Curated annotation (Swiss-Prot):
Start-end of Polar residues biased regions: 898-915
Species the sequence originates in: Mus musculus (Mouse)
Residues that hold ATP according to the record: D530, K531, T532, F623, R681, D746, D861, G862, T863, N864, D865
Residues bearing glycans: N284, N417
Membrane topology note: Multi-pass membrane protein
Gene3D superfamilies documented for this protein: Calcium-transporting ATPase, cytoplasmic domain N, Calcium-transporting ATPase, cytoplasmic transduction domain A, HAD superfamily/HAD-like
Region (P-domain): 509-538, 724-882, 946-961
Record's protein name: Endoplasmic reticulum transmembrane helix translocase
Cellular component per GO, a single term: endoplasmic reticulum membrane
Upper taxonomic lineage: Eukaryota, Metazoa, Chordata, Craniata, Vertebrata
Amino acid sequence: MAVVGNAVPCGARPGGARDNGSPQPGSRLRPGLAAGPALIANGDELVAAVWPYRRLALLRRLTVLPFAGLLYPAWLGAAASGCWGWGSSWTQIPEAALLALATICLAHALTVLSGHWSVHAHCALTCTPEYDPNKVTFVKVVPTPNNGSTELVALHRDKGEDGLEVLSFEFQKIKYSYDALEKKQFLPVAFPVGNAFSYYQSNRGFQEDSEIRAAEKKFGSNKAEMVVPDFSELFKERATAPFFVFQVFCVGLWCLDEYWYYSVFTLSMLVAFEASLVQQQMRNMSEIRKMGNKPHMIQVYRSRKWRPVASDDIVPGDIVSIGRSPQENLVPCDVLLLRGRCIVDEAMLTGESVPQMKEPIEDLSPDRVLDLQADARLHVIFGGTKVVQHIPPQKATSGLKPVDNGCVAFVLRTGFNTSQGRLLRTILFGVKRVTANNLETFIFILFLLVFAIAAAAYVWVEGTKDPSRNRYKLFLECTLILTSVVPPELPIELSLAVNTSLIALAKLYMYCTEPFRIPFAGKVEVCCFDKTGTLTSDSLVVRGVAGLRDGKEVTPVSSIPIETHRALASCHSLMQLDDGTLVGDPLEKAMLTAVDWTLTKDEKVFPRSIKTQGLKIHQRFHFASALKRMSVLASYEKLGSTDLCYIAAVKGAPETLHSMFSQCPPDYHHIHTEISREGARVLALGYKELGHLTHQQAREIKREALECSLKFVGFIVVSCPLKADSKAVIREIQNASHRVVMITGDNPLTACHVAQELHFIDKAHTLILHPPSEKGQPCEWRSIDSSIVLPLTLGSPKALALEHALCLTGDGLAHLQAVDPQQLLCLIPHVQVFARVAPKQKEFVITSLKELGYVTLMCGDGTNDVGALKHADVGVALLANAPERVVERRRRPRDSPVLSNSGPRVSRSTKQKSALLSPEEPPASHRDRLSQVLRDLEEESTPIVKLGDASIAAPFTSKLSSIQCICHVIKQGRCTLVTTLQMFKILALNALILAYSQSVLYLEGVKFSDFQATLQGLLLAGCFLFISRSKPLKTLSRERPLPNIFNLYTILTVMLQFSVHFLSLVYLYREAQARSPEKQEQFVDLYKEFEPSLVNSTVYIMAMAMQMATFAINYKGPPFMESLPENKPLVWSLAVSLLAIIGLLLGSSPDFNSQFGLVDIPVEFKLVIGQVLALDFCLALLADRVLQFFLGTPKLRVPS
């Protein structure tokens, strides 16, 4: 058997694997073993590299061997030999021995835990690279970027059909098998998706049971469901996370330091919080699990007859019957339609509200090879979709006919390999979720750790000067100081801010699947928009037909000639459902409505407003993106005769059809270009009389015979009006210091016109990049009116963008990608319109902007945008219609509208359009309506996005089609970001004050009682809770928030405020000491029972006052969130804290003071404390505001 080769990531740059921290197996292999190429096929969509490993025996693992075999025995040996200078008792452990043991235990714990935190570390610690296929037990699978995280998976061994052993593994529900004979690589299971049409047309399914068993073994079952882990498994995963482990460690230290109440209170809070997150995770997983198809019986042609088979037992290669199901069952897998026609509702999969027509391949050329990219839209029915109507195969023709009168289809893919399965995998394993425990948080903690180490070192050095002091207790205190820089409540506080925004967005009909992306919305620099259906409306308006008269004059539809009528009435893919509903492309519906013809179920069209014969559609050659045209064969009865006269009708892109016309107007190109510049959509129409044809000729006629020698019958001109609020929203986004970019598949001239209308473009000329017409020629920038022509090489993109607006087409992008990718990367940030781009190119634009360091937002709808939405920092998917459940819940007799708390209102009926509140409405009615809406919303829990809810791969989904949601997301993002940053400032100040209190003051005998620590913790928790409840302001400000913690303003304000607090604390401490009895002993007894004293009471009151001051001073307020007086809960929380401080200072309740271990303070000293507190507050506030004025306003980095 062939040997598993050395695994090197394919396509990675040298050292690429080291970038992600994976251990590199040695390049030199054992003698006698052949070194094969990379273990994964180059260009695999999911897997980048595979590394083979063998699990080590328990005692040989690095998590056990160095510790059990070396470090612990060495420590015990040193203790036994008296190296540590051991006393007579085990209680008198020398500090060196204690430090050594603690260090070994900590290193051991971290080593074990690092295996939980990192797959690469786990492999290095517990496995060894192995190249002998007989010994390999696991493989480490590294996915391609943005496709989940690295996993260590078991390697399975099965017997193949030829009796040889086959190695395979499963990664993210996809099976990979090792090809030992040819490629020496792991390959995904090959599904029958690239054969010639003759293979499918002549296929008769599985004839023998042995073939079925072999297929089941190769492809697995047709199940796309996930197993929901139990509570304990998920909780264990969270309980071993770095933050949680650290927090539990801190709680343990506090318990050792006799802070029992505080420790138990904090630990309970942590466990409850993590448990609630696990419950929420389990609920979400259960919802996702329900999205998979439910098994049902389906007719399958096996062993030469039709028989009912459970849908989860279907395998690729089966012939199945597909049709409309009375139980509304979904299509169980991806199938190729062989015979019969279907109308399919794909909304459950793509969010596309328009049902799609699917055509069979029975009459297509047998030599043509199935291309899923090109053929899927027309011939493949995807799993998870619903057949709303089907036309069974004609009885007169030969071939298979299902017993249930369904359509005949060939099974292509099953399980998680289907389109629906891929979407489910995206939800389960896709882009790594953004969490609170990010790199910035850790760097921030390391910054604070510097001060903590200095404080701990001071305690150790000063504390060890007293020979009688317990070194164990001193070591414990030093450890506590080091841990104090990471507040245990940090993740909770970050989550609180995010959850507040989550609830606010839910009330605005927005659903978020990745809540920790919300702060990224506050950092957004570039906002990218799709055009069709996002910026422009779906309600299309047919302006008329151009090119029939002189120049670009548009003829009204009522005055067009009969040939144009026939071309428009017949050349479409529309279908009528059983209930009379017309389904198909909105553009084609608008055209048929404009000419006022009626379509019937049997493919006939009849005029309503003009007197002429009806048409019967015989053959459709559907629109394809590559061909940019559609043609049909139709017929009408001659007057006074039953003879049929056949016609050809063609419509498509004007530049494509030009060569097909026998003659056309001399200003043909000028007309369609000029109209496109005005923002209209233009399609050329062709017509041809074919005369009499036999039935066989009509059935066998080729597309080429229709698409030649055509008569030009006009340009159909369709306007796509902008959505009512697009202009206002884009203006608001631009005024808020964002760069806006359009990324669309539409015509560049139309796209540029819309961009100009929306003020994306404010330059006099827009240059479009034209790739060379011949090889070797340079690319050219050409203005829309062709008055400016510049070579691409002339000047830098930045200089060019200062004078002109730039538009890049899909062709231009593809050319630069192939010729000069570096120049393309420099150009992308300066382009304002990307037109005629394919879905993959949209994704490329977004990932390129991210690579260049820009925080990007993508807003779009439909399947074309899924990749871009998934990879953007903030992806917002718009739904064309609000979900029915929301609509039905809100129907009232008056059908009153819903008011969002940002101004615009949205109708409860899907038929009503978005509008602004009329200024005449009384404020009271506004308030009543708002309160009613909020009551309605509170009745529902936050919904889980279902597969029908559009681009489920997007982190944000808006249930309304207005782009107003982008403003809501940015407002909430900025508010959350500012809240998060101010929390970090507050935590930093509190941590620094605590480090000083626990070091210098601790050695002077100042410490807090358990009750004091608990009261302080409760008051602090109240302030943190309400500071996270801040709401954004109604309008976006031009000022941008600081994007991260590490900036000059944050560092300086923290250091200056700390200096003010530090000096105040030192001054009051010394004043209190001067008023206290002199110390008799040289060294303070740090371990005696807590005793109230003037010094302790002064420091405690000062510490509480400073903590409350940090909240009041560092609360940001306008322009990103409501001001402090408007945040009533926080004001009340600060007021309660202030009253508590004043009460404790004045001693208004002696019993209360006594309970919390405070002594009576002399009156004159109370005045001193009060004055110092006031001065401390004023100086810290002044320092922050001055720094804010000079350093606190960042500028937009992107070229504008």
